[in-house]
Amino acid sequence: MLLLSSISVAEAADPTLLAETGAFLLGNAYRCGVSTERVTRAGNVIRGMIASLSKDAGEKEVAGARFSDRFRLSAYPAADRDVLTPPCSVVVTQFERLERRHREAGYTE
């Protein structure tokens, strides 16, 4: 649960940390049945934030790759690996909190 809530307090200047925590939440939200449209919308906001925080194209590319990797691992956890798979009730609550914060801050796609 700590990792899920860390997206709101991720180091503002660290696009890779934002990518990892954001993708962890979004991947798990997708796994838990949150609509593709909602996950995509939140992902677009997070990717935009990553782009604006990145110092250069290389940093943006690294963060983007981490986002893609972490999302895939969270959305489709392998049964044979020991991975953190939070309960869907927690994931959906945190995802809804993220959506609310995005709306309050005026973030759009």
Locate predicted features.
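Compact alpha-helical subdomains of small soluble proteins
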Residues: 41-109
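Intrinsic disorder/low-complexity segments in short proteins, especially the signal peptide
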Residues: 7-9, 58
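Bacterial N-terminal signal peptides
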Residues: 1-6
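Immediate post-signal-peptide N-terminus of mature secreted/exported proteins
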Residues: 12-41
